Amino acid sequence: MRAARALLPLLLQACWTAAQDEPETPRAVAFQDCPVDLFFVLDTSESVALRLKPYGALVDKVKSFTKRFIDNLRDRYYRCDRNLVWNAGALHYSDEVEIIQGLTRMPGGRDALKSSVDAVKYFGKGTYTDCAIKKGLEQLLVGGSHLKENKYLIVVTDGHPLEGYKEPCGGLEDAVNEAKHLGVKVFSVAITPDHLEPRLSIIATDHTYRRNFTAADWGQSRDAEEAISQTIDTIVDMIKNNVEQVCCSFECQPARGPPGLRGDPGFEGERGKPGLPGEKGEAGDPGRPGDLGPVGYQGMKGEKGSRGEKGSRGPKGYKGEKGKRGIDGVDGVKGEMGYPGLPGCKGSPGFDGIQGPPGPKGDPGAFGLKGEKGEPGADGEAGRPGSSGPSGDEGQPGEPGPPGEKGEAGDEGNPGPDGAPGERGGPGERGPRGTPGTRGPRGDPGEAGPQGDQGREGPVGVPGDPGEAGPIGPKGYRGDEGPPGSEGARGAPGPAGPPGDPGLMGERGEDGPAGNGTEGFPGFPGYPGNRGAPGINGTKGYPGLKGDEGEAGDPGDDNNDIAPRGVKGAKGYRGPEGPQGPPGHQGPPGPDECEILDIIMKMCSCCECKCGPIDLLFVLDSSESIGLQNFEIAKDFVVKVIDRLSRDELVKFEPGQSYAGVVQYSHSQMQEHVSLRSPSIRNVQELKEAIKSLQWMAGGTFTGEALQYTRDQLLPPSPNNRIALVITDGRSDTQRDTTPLNVLCSPGIQVVSVGIKDVFDFIPGSDQLNVISCQGLAPSQGRPGLSLVKENYAELLEDAFLKNVTAQICIDKKCPDYTCPITFSSPADITILLDGSASVGSHNFDTTKRFAKRLAERFLTAGRTDPAHDVRVAVVQYSGTGQQRPERASLQFLQNYTALASAVDAMDFINDATDVNDALGYVTRFYREASSGAAKKRLLLFSDGNSQGATPAAIEKAVQEAQRAGIEIFVVVVGRQVNEPHIRVLVTGKTAEYDVAYGESHLFRVPSYQALLRGVFHQTVSRKVALG
């Protein structure tokens, strides 16, 4: 025994030493542990990855949220002697799902899980949330604990897209319903802003698992950080509370301790809530029949009756009142004057005019024959009434009338005297229980008893209060008609009726005794007597004078009978030949060559400018950030552009002519195209149907790779004009797509980029759009294109934008040349002399300057038979005496159109008097000093013939002085208020005679200043000035 006691300390020391030598192992999950399986599902699709620059910044915030959440997964001890422990894992997804790390025990695997999350590279493609949720469920069920009540998913997403493509794993609702069926709770956490709340609400198990949870926000504000921290704390607390109810239920608690001492009696409880409604009672006795119901509703409209007979024509209506004066409309913009049309054919003979008014009254005719005897005259009118006859005797009294109706009931009588007092009644029944009294004051607290054990799970609570009344339901249908009621009680007597009609007149009574009254007044005249016999006819009177002419009678009936055609007369003899008439005036010359070419251009349809043949390619961004609705609008835009080119620009999309194709793209190796070269497409109609059938891809954005695909597949070498129209949001994933965006740029291709805001309302990236459209490249590297930016996709379908796009596509039209070219065969110095007087006006002077610039451009760009022949132009403004601009010192002939146009634009309107003679002398001196002898000298003068103090003789002298200097004068006249004699002298230099042929080639007339800029007038003037 003593030996055993001595050996015991040695054995204990050996065991302790052996235990210290064993390697340390991770703590195993004890029986009393309560494990929780938590799995993160992270969205790294395009709508998240490419929303912020630099691309992937929002994904980094999602990863930061996940790592912060993992740091908050700490064990907890419950009072039921159980420990909450965590198992966590994560995956990320786009249109594919990748497991970051499976379920790992915390805290031992915390660092490894955080490192794996930090190493995630975003996919940046489509969004298959249903597949990701089902993959997360698989990880929870296969690798998790045995408690299915403690399994949670945290889905971090922006909810995009809302619609547009079929999710391949059964859809989002199917995945969420599967999670509910398996008992897995799903939290939905938003990536704000621009998240789709409806989709997030579908993902969450119920509204308590959604709330306003946020994983990442754009701003770095304090509020945003607090919202993210609050999201993590709220989710962790909800899980801990739920787990406590699961792991600390009554079945899982350890053995209970001994019962405690009986406590003091509690205070009287408050009055309980009303009990539940009792069972429905038996049906009561039937009530008495109701009163007669109200009049029923109007019945349904009957069928349409047969058509009635035609009514008689109504009377002619009165003339209506004069209407009120309407509101003055807005003045419309005056349109441009149209080109004069060709003379029309001779019209058909007109209809007969309206019959003229009746002529004046004719002279009275001769007396007619004696008339026949007239008929007897009409009866005469009644005579005056005769005197009144004597009054009649008094009649006998009449018989009594029938008895009257029963009178109304009388008023109630006064109350009678009080009766004798009755006997004392017996005791009444017991009354209802009174209301309880007010609660007494609270007593002093007793001594605190020992702390009791945790109570059991309480019973099921009483039902809650009934909810608020629902909304009023729709009006019910009309019920069946009730049975007729019983006959009512007799009503009170009605009011007295009106007095009856007077009775019949009684028979005449006997004559009474003679009266003794005074004689009455004479009676009224009696009624007229009968008509007397006709008297003897008088002697016949003399005939009266003829009456005035009566009014014209109504026109007789039309005579529709065709009169027989008369016999054709014999042909007459030919008359003698008349003398020869004098020669007519010389007619105006016919239209010149420029006007003839203009008429041909207007009349001939084959003269229209033709667009094409062209090779037209559309490249459509079909990524997730575009959205389904915007992609559908882009397809409609393509179809409308093709229709407009076919209809308005007469482009023929058929083999051997023009070609069209469409490419839609998303991420890497995800491109699709349809074109007229496809084997299944035979014509442009089938091409449009194929475009409408394209399905939205909803993936990432690899624009460079798509443009390379377009160049390789759809842009072979071709002699046609090649145009590529790229529609995108300008946010290509250039970090992973290394293909340059200017891959389409080449001298033979024109690229137009259209940037439009995406579903997140982000402004398109102008830097990428400029690169796509070949901006800033040398001509040898590529043809500069065009970059356009729009607010939204709906603007693509606006009429103005469609016109601009078709105009840009057909910018290189092939048009016939009807410009009426001019050629100079010798050197020429031309001066354009503008009228700057007050009668012209500032606005008209600006129009004249624009016309002068057109003429100058035609002169300076005209062809020359010899390149050594110089054509020089000067523009001068004149007004009163000594008022010519520019001054002589600065006036010179110019050959550079840009310099000349700048000088014309800088001219200020003088706005003073008019002195044509002084202006002619100024120009004549200028030609003598600045013009060479070999050059043709031409002067184009603007004038209305009115000049200050000028006479025909003075004008003739100034013009002849210019002609002696070799100057040929051409005159432009605007308007109708002109001095015609002075104009003729300015053109010919002669006051005696006027050469019409010479005048027609040197005088130009227009009705207004606006007409200077219409049509080909500037071509006509410049051609005649050049030919001389």
Curated annotation (Swiss-Prot):
The UniProt annotation puts the region (C-terminal globular domain) at 593-1028
Alphabetized Pfam families for the sequence:
Collagen, VWA
Give the GO biological process terms: 2-oxoglutarate metabolic process; adipose tissue development; apoptotic nuclear changes; autophagy; basement membrane organization; bone development; bone mineralization; canonical Wnt signaling pathway
| Biased composition annotated in UniProt, kind: Low complexity | 384-394, 457-471, 483-493
Q: Which residues form the signal peptide?
A: 1-19
In terms of superkingdom, the source organism counts as: Eukaryota
The record's InterPro entries line, in alphabetical order, gives: Collagen, ECM_Assembly_Org, VWF_A, vWFA_dom_sf
Keywords of the record, alphabetical order, are: Cell adhesion, Collagen, Congenital muscular dystrophy, Disease variant, Extracellular matrix, Glycoprotein, Hydroxylation, Repeat, Secreted, Signal
Q: Where is this motif: Cell attachment site?
A: 262-264, 442-444, 478-480
Q: Spell out the Basic and acidic residues composition-biased ranges.
A: 268-285, 301-334
How does the record describe the protein's post-translational processing? Prolines at the third position of the tripeptide repeating unit (G-X-Y) are hydroxylated in some or all of the chains.
Q: Where is this region: Triple-helical region?
A: 257-592
Bias-annotated ranges (Pro residues)? 579-590
Chain residue ranges for the region called Disordered: 254-590
Q: Name one GO cellular component term.
A: collagen type VI trimer
According to the UniProt entry, which residue ranges have a biased composition of type Acidic residues? 550-560
Q: Is Secreted among the key words of this record?
A: yes
Q: Describe the effect of K571T.
A: In BTHLM1A; uncertain significance
Compartments (UniProt record): Secreted, Extracellular space, Extracellular matrix
Protein purpose: Collagen VI acts as a cell-binding protein.
User: What clinical condition does the entry mention?
Assistant: Bethlem myopathy 1A: A form of Bethlem myopathy, a slowly progressive muscular dystrophy characterized by joint contractures, most frequently affecting the elbows and ankles, and muscle weakness and wasting involving the proximal and extensor muscles more than the distal and flexor ones. The clinical onset more often occurs in childhood or adulthood, but it can be prenatal with decreased fetal movements or neonatal with hypotonia. The hallmark of Bethlem myopathy is long finger flexion contractures. Inheritance can be autosomal dominant or autosomal recessive. Ullrich congenital muscular dystrophy 1A: A form of Ullrich congenital muscular dystrophy, a disease characterized by generalized muscle weakness and striking hypermobility of distal joints in conjunction with variable contractures of more proximal joints and normal intelligence. Additional findings may include kyphoscoliosis, protruded calcanei, and follicular hyperkeratosis (rough skin). More severely affected patients manifest at birth and never achieve independent ambulation, while patients with milder phenotypes might maintain ambulation into adulthood.
Please state what the protein is called. Answer: Collagen alpha-1(VI) chain
The record lists the organism as Homo sapiens (Human)
Instruction: State the gene name recorded for this protein.
Output: COL6A1
